[in-house]
């Protein structure tokens, strides 16, 4: 009752109580508060958030355009597949086959083809391939090349062979039984390819036994199985030539060749002499061709080549030179670099010229040494080279009375020469008739020691022709070299045939008969003139040239020819015949007659140099350019072959033989114009050598062009059977630009070796799709296709030619033959292929694409490295990469400098680039139109120029590592088109201050449809890039793969003074006001503190006197030379710097960079993660340490400010902060700069948590992607880019070294500042109590380690991929790993800037100094002082912020 009467009413009153709170709010205060809020929002959104207004409006468009461009390029390759599948005629296939001869003039072409015939072959018919057949071409169908197996390798027993039919395929699909002999299939020749080998073509010119009027026919036999099949009588002709040497090149003495005795062979080639006597006497394998289907072959008989040699000897010499060049590139180069047959190549050289070791007479040898010593004593110089000349022989004293002599006065007398015996030495000289008789009996070979006779000049009176001592041994050296090489007077003269008019009597065309008769009396005229000059040369050696020339151009022989021809040539000759006569006169040598052999030797003797090398010195290094032909006067020289060990990449030497007095060295490289295959080192010295320099040798051989015929004859007669076999079965292939070699899915029937040019490998994901992935680019010296051939699978990709390319094809069947007959060669190839396959797996596993040594995979892994699986890396998203085509194996052989428009200083730029490339250790040569025209000479504007150009360019690529083509001609010039077609990489030069419109040269580039890599070179007058200007150049140029900023001021613009402007009166007042304002400011600033003073100066420079184009200084440090940086990048020797993430610990990056600069280490590419991306981006932007120091310190102060962080806090749903202050701090450092505007190449990475991939950023606004790379999860929100959320790149790769190696960096300095992983073993059982964890942390006596909390576990989980990537980076070859001692600093210790900076600098300085002292610092190209360094006028400034 009490409850209801007392409590309830009071409770009701309490609930009905009303409270009134009055807060007086003045209208003015409300207005002020609203103003503050609105102002804050306006400042934050409009002014403080300017960075958010920067829209990347061209990023997506660039990506789409680049992809479309690449797809279009791939589509052009697809269209090219059908390019050669249309209708082709016999003529097309014939012209394709004779490309091996090079360009042929019309008369030469007609001379070769007028006797050509075709033969129809039915399936199964046999063609015997020997020299009598001539040059054979397959114009329709397919032929199989078969090789007779030795009995040692024949499996069938004698009874089985006896019971076999005339033609029976054995169990092996690639073998046949013909008349009981087993033949192995080595190659399949298809339509448009020649059956004749390179050696057999040269033999068509050198085979003097073939009669010019003898017709030759192929020996064909129908070998279809059946009792009626005719048997092959006798043995099939031996391989190429029955007179060739057997196993080791020993020739039949009946042919004038004198084999090396077994004792000599054992003393020079131990490895070759180990073969048994049976091997030496074994017959050379026979070669035949079998028609695999009904086919047609075209045959140019050997008589056509002999007629060509008589009528057009210079053209024949050109063909021989072309074949010799291809013999080296196809056969010798494949044998040397791929099959490891260097020994046999050097043995070929030995057999060619050193079989008969002709020593210089002792008195000449001592005279040379004495004269050389006296010259050094007189001049007081240590130079080891003097110019001299040689003569050639020693004389049999028993026959000295049979020859004429001339007296030579010698100056040297010593204790070995009693009295005056050598004061008046008679030199033997044969008279012309004796010399001709001698040379005719030994024209095809050098003389043996027993048959040795000196080559004698004319029998002149000793009183008229008394020689000095120097000229005597110069002529003696020349004569000995000539004798060794088999060069005689008949050798240098074009061959003359007395029955030349009989060749074409069977022809019915009157024009041809008339031309033939004209040629006959011309040849007869030349023959009579030659005989006349031979009789007159004894008395009038100088006038004989004029007389001989008179005979060939008219004079007395004209009347004789009129009697032969019945009409006057001078009255009946037409304009066409005049042109024909001019061409023939050029082919006969023009004014250079060959009758005076003494003048030839005189020309060679003028070029002789004498060199002296001490014991142990190197005369010639392997892979160096040819220096010329050496003759060893005194001493001994080791011929050494250097081979690299594939496992350790170290080279080891092996002495092939030791050359003694009388040996000729450097012959093969000088004749073929190739790099030396061996090293020449003095083993017993001092060694004196006579040298005919390479340039002089080339000039004289071009003058006396018939020398090439003799040299080719000696070379072909000395080839070993293995080289002959290779020559016959290696196929030379020529591809035009954008032509497809083979398509993906084609049968793998051969291995290819790139001889010249460049190819690209493409992979199609689907046969019906145009989606293409570029796999790799292949350049000169690289091979491909081995894996498919050895595993018998189809082609894994499509290969297309980027530019005109030459290749050597090794058939699959040849591999199988080598496996049976030469297991050692096959083992060598198998090791190389296995190594390549291992490297491919290694690259595909960890993302590498470059050819790096596999040092970390073979036997040297540490226990820690074995714990990590390098295949667990998270690959980058390729669609985000702008420079998708960056090649990691930068091995450009040719560079093209092409201006975008007229007026750019291309030649000056080329001069500096070539000097920089040379400073980087690359042998480089530049070609412009002027130098090329001077080489082409009179052929500059005729059809022969294309042939001479291609040969000239190929020769330069052999001699130099990089050839730079300079497009210094107008856009309509053919030279500009040539430069575009020859470039592996095209450098487009553009003036960065001009309008970025498409230039006329770019239109020509697009019209040429080249697929070569194209880089843009932006030339700046100062080291400054206007923010955003680079993207204007790139956004409309989808064909650009990369760009480079280069400071370059043309020399003609340096001295130009600035124009004096006309100042108007109003302008004068403005200038006077500014001057007074400046004085007032200076007086006012004196009374301000330093902090305010800096702000006033900044505002004054920004608003009162702004400079639209600020001047930036150029560093005087040579390591920052832009041309050296470009040269290292283009030559694959770039130096990269990778800066890892680690928060405040990354401030030590600044000290590491300072230490690198002090050590003289240049940086060409920079990459980074998190704080490393920030510091690296600042350095890449200015490429100088001074300005970035202040910016990094300012940023550290902003991030370390507690008040700024508190003002940026937000509700912690996604992150604790909004990210505004962090964004603004980064933006204030980079402003509106884009990554493309950075002075040196730069990239950073981030983690795409939307697509779960790693993003690589190398374009776009710098602040945005650097902010993405620094976005620590939980502290900062992710950055959104095209709908993808980007976080800190350290979660996937905290040290992105892999991307750096993919960009072609040879040396990478990787700085790791990440936290150290806690690898303490844990042991707490199968369950875990949280209270125990807390007590364990507080218990100081506990033996259990601290258990990580949930946050630590999540962090470790996020960094699993990064730890694996870090271990992979440490084991990457070429990486210098740097880890400063910054473990005591936390991630957010930005307030300790100076301390962390000094720690990084001190450690970097000591670390690099330690590497240098231990000689472990990798050599960096371009860092040594060079004579090529340019001294430029540079703008300087003081070292201040």
Curated annotation (Swiss-Prot):
Stated role: Intracellular phospholipase B that catalyzes the double deacylation of phosphatidylcholine (PC) to glycerophosphocholine (GroPCho). Plays an important role in membrane lipid homeostasis. Responsible for the rapid PC turnover in response to inositol, elevated temperatures, or when choline is present in the growth medium.
RNA-binding recorded as keyword: no
Binding site residues for a nucleoside 3',5'-cyclic phosphate 1: 592-718
Short motif (GXGXXG): ranges: 1141-1146
Active site per database record: 1170, 1288
Gene Ontology BP terms: lipid catabolic process; phosphatidylcholine metabolic process
Membrane topology field: Single-pass type I membrane protein
Residues binding a nucleoside 3',5'-cyclic phosphate 2, per UniProt: 707-836
Family indicated by similarity: Belongs to the NTE family.
Organism of this sequence: Kluyveromyces lactis (strain ATCC 8585 / CBS 2359 / DSM 70799 / NBRC 1267 / NRRL Y-1140 / WM37)
Lineage: Eukaryota, Fungi, Dikarya, Ascomycota, Saccharomycotina
GO molecular function: lysophospholipase activity
Organism superkingdom: Eukaryota
Transmembrane annotation, as ranges: 23-43
Localization per Swiss-Prot or TrEMBL: Endoplasmic reticulum membrane
EC code: 3.1.1.5
Reactions it catalyzes: a 1-acyl-sn-glycero-3-phosphocholine + H2O = sn-glycerol 3-phosphocholine + a fatty acid + H(+)
Residues in compartment: Cytoplasmic: 44-1441
Documented activity regulation: Inhibited by organophosphorus esters.
Region (Disordered): 154-173, 210-236, 376-445, 551-585
Motif (DGA/G): 1288-1290
UniProt topological domain (Lumenal) ranges: 1-22
Name recorded for this polypeptide: Lysophospholipase NTE1
Keyword Protein transport: no
């Amino acid at each position: 009752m009490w409850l209801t009467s007392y409590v309830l009413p009071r409770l009701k009153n309490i609930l009905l109580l009303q409270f009134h709170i009055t807060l007086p709010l003045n209208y003015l205060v409300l207005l002020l508060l609203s103003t503050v809020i609105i102002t804050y929002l306006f400042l934050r959104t409009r002014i403080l958030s300017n960075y958010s207004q920067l829209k990347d409006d061209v990023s997506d468009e660039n990506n789409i355009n680049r992809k479309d461009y690449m797809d279009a390029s791939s589509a052009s390759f697809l269209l090219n597949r059908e390019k050669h599948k249309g209708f082709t005629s016999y003529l097309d296939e014939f012209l394709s086959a004779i490309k091996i001869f090079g360009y042929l003039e019309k008369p030469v072409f007609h001379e070769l083809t007028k006797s050509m015939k075709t033969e129809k072959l039915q399936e199964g018919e046999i063609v015997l391939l020997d020299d009598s057949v001539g040059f054979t071409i397959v114009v329709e169908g397919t032929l199989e090349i078969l090789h007779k197996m030795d009995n040692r390798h024949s499996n069938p027993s004698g009874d089985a062979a006896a019971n076999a039919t005339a033609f029976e395929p054995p169990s092996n699909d690639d073998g046949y039984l013909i008349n009981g002999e087993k033949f192995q299939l080595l190659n399949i020749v298809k339509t448009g390819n020649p059956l004749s080998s390179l050696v057999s073509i040269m033999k068509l010119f050198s085979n003097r036994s073939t009669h010019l009027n003898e017709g030759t026919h192929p020996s064909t036999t129908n070998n279809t199985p059946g009792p009626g099949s005719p048997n092959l009588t006798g043995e099939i002709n031996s391989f190429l030539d029955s007179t060739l040497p057997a196993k080791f090149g020993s020739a039949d003495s009946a042919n004038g060749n004198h084999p090396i005795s077994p004792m000599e062979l054992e003393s020079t080639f131990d490895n070759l002499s180990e073969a048994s006597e049976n091997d030496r006497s074994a017959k050379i394998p026979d070669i035949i061709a079998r028609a695999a289907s009904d086919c047609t072959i075209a045959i140019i008989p050997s008589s056509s080549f002999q007629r060509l040699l008589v009528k057009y000897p210079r053209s024949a010499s050109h063909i021989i030179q072309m074949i010799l060049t291809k013999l080296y590139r196809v056969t010798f180069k494949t044998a040397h670099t791929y099959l490891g047959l260097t020994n046999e190549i050097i043995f070929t050289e030995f057999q060619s010229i050193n079989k008969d070791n002709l020593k210089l007479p002792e008195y000449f040898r001592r005279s040379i040494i004495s004269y050389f010593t006296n010259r050094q004593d007189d001049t007081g110089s240590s130079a080891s080279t003097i110019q001299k000349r040689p003569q050639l022989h020693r004389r049999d004293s028993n026959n000295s009375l049979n020859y004429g002599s001339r007296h030579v006065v010698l100056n040297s007398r010593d204790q070995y020469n009693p009295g005056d015996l050598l004061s008046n030495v008679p030199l033997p000289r044969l008279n012309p008739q004796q010399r001709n008789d001698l040379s005719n009996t030994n024209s095809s070979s050098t003389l043996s020691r027993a048959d040795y006779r000196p080559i004698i000049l004319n029998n002149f009176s000793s009183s008229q022709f008394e020689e000095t001592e120097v000229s005597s041994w110069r002529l003696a050296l020349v004569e000995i070299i000539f004798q060794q090489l088999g060069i005689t007077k008949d050798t240098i003269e074009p061959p003359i045939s007395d029955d030349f008019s009989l060749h074409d009597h069977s022809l019915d065309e009157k024009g041809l008969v008339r031309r033939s008769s004209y040629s006959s009396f011309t040849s007869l005229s030349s023959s009579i003139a030659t005989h006349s000059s031979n009789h007159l040369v004894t008395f009038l050696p100088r006038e004989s040239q004029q007389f001989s020339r008179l005979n060939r151009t008219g004079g007395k022989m004209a009347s004789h020819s009129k009697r032969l021809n019945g009409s006057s040539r001078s009255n009946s000759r037409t304009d066409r015949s005049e042109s024909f006569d001019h061409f023939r006169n050029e082919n006969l040598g023009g004014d250079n007659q060959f009758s005076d052999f003494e003048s030839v030797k005189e020309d060679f003797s003028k070029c002789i140099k004498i060199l002296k090398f001490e014991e142990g010195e190197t005369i010639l290094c392997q892979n160096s350019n040819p220096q010329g032909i050496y003759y060893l006067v005194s001493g001994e020289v080791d011929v050494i072959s250097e081979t690299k060990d594939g496992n350790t990449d170290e080279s080891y030497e092996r002495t092939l033989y030791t050359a003694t007095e009388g040996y000729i060295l450097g012959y093969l490289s000088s004749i073929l114009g190739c790099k030396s295959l061996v090293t020449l080192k003095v083993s017993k010295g001092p060694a004196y050598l006579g040298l005919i320099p390479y340039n002089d040798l080339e000039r004289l051989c071009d003058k006396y062009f018939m020398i090439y015929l003799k040299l080719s004859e000696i070379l072909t007669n000395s080839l070993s059977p293995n080289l002959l076999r290779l020559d016959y079965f290696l196929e030379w292939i020529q591809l035009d630009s954008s032509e497809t070699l083979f398509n993906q899915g084609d049968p793998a029937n051969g291995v290819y070796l790139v001889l010249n040019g460049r190819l690209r490998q493409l992979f199609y994901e689907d046969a019906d799709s145009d989606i293409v992935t570029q796999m790799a680019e292949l350049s000169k010296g690289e091979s491909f296709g081995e894996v498919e051939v050895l595993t018998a699978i189809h082609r894994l990709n499509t290969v297309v030619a980027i530019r005109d390319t030459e290749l050597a094809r090794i058939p699959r069947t040849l591999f199988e033959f080598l496996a049976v007959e030469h297991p050692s060669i096959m083992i060598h190839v198998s090791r190389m292929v296995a190594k390549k396959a291992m490297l491919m797996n290694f690259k595909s596993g960890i993302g590498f694409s470059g050819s790096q040594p596999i040092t970390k995979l073979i036997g040297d892994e540490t226990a820690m490295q074995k714990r990590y699986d390098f295949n667990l890396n998270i690959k980058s998203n390729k669609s985000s990469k702008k420079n998708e085509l960056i090649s990691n194996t930068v091995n450009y052989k040719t560079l093209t400098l092409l201006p975008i428009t007229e007026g750019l200083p291309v030649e000056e730029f080329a001069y500096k680039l070539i000097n920089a490339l040379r400073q980087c250790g690359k042998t480089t040569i530049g070609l412009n139109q002027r130098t090329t025209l001077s080489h082409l000479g009179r052929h500059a504007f005729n059809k022969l120029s294309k042939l001479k150009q291609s040969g000239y360019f190929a020769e330069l690529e052999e001699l130099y590592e990089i050839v730079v083509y300079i497009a210094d001609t107008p856009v309509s010039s053919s030279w500009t088109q040539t430069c575009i077609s020859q470039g592996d990489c095209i450098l487009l030069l553009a003036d960065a201050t001009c309008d970025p419109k498409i230039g006329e040269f770019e239109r020509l580039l697009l019209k040429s449809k080249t697929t070569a890599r194209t880089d843009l070179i932006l030339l700046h007058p100062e080291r400054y890039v206007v923010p955003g200007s680079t993207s204007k150049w790139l956004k409309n140029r989808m064909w650009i793969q990369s760009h480079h900023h280069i400071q370059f001021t043309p020399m003609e613009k340096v001295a130009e003074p600035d124009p004096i402007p006309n100042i108007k009166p109003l302008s004068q007042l403005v200038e006077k006001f500014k001057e007074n304002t400046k004085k007032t400011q200076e007086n006012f600033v004196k009374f301000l503190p330093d902090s305010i003073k800096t702000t006033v100066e900044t505002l004054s420079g920004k608003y009162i006197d702004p400079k639209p184009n600020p001047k930036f200084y150029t560093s005087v440090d040579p390591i920052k030379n832009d041309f050296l940086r470009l040269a290292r990048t283009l030559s694959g020797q770039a130096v990269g710097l990778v800066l890892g993430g680690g928060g405040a610990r990354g401030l030590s990056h600044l000290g590491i960079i300072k230490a690198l600069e002090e050590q003289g280490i240049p940086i060409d590419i920079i990459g980074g993660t998190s704080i490393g991306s920030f510091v690296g981006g600042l350095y890449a932007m200015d490429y100088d340490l001074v300005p970035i120091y202040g910016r990094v310190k300012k940023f550290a102060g902003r991030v370390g400010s507690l008040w700024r962080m508190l003002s940026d806090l937000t509700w912690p749903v996604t992150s604790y902060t909004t990210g505004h202050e962090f964004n603004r701090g980064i933006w204030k450092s980079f402003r509106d700069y884009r990554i493309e505007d950075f002075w040196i190449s730069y990239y950073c990475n981030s983690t795409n948590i939307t697509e779960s991939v790693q993003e690589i950023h190398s374009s776009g606004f710098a602040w945005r992607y650097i902010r993405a790379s620094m976005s620590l999860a939980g502290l900062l929100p992710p950055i959104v880019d095209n709908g993808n959320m980007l976080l800190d790149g350290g979660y996937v790769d905290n040290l992105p070294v892999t991307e750096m190696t993919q960009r072609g960096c040879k040396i990478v300095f990787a700085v790791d500042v990440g936290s150290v992983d806690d690898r303490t073993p844990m042991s707490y059982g199968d369950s875990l109590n949280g209270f125990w964890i807390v007590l364990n942390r507080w218990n100081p006596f506990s033996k259990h380690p601290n258990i990580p909390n949930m946050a630590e576990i999540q962090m470790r989980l996020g960094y699993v991929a990064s730890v694996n990537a870090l271990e992979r980076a440490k084991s990457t070859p070429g990486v210098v790993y740097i880890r400063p001692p910054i473990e005591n600093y936390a991630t957010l210790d930005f307030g300790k800037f100076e301390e962390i900076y000094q720690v990084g600098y001190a450690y970097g300085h000591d670390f690099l100094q330690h590497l240098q002292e231990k000689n472990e610092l990798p050599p960096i190209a371009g860092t040594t002082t060079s004579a090529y360094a340019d001294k430029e006028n540079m703008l300087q400034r003081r070292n201040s912020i």
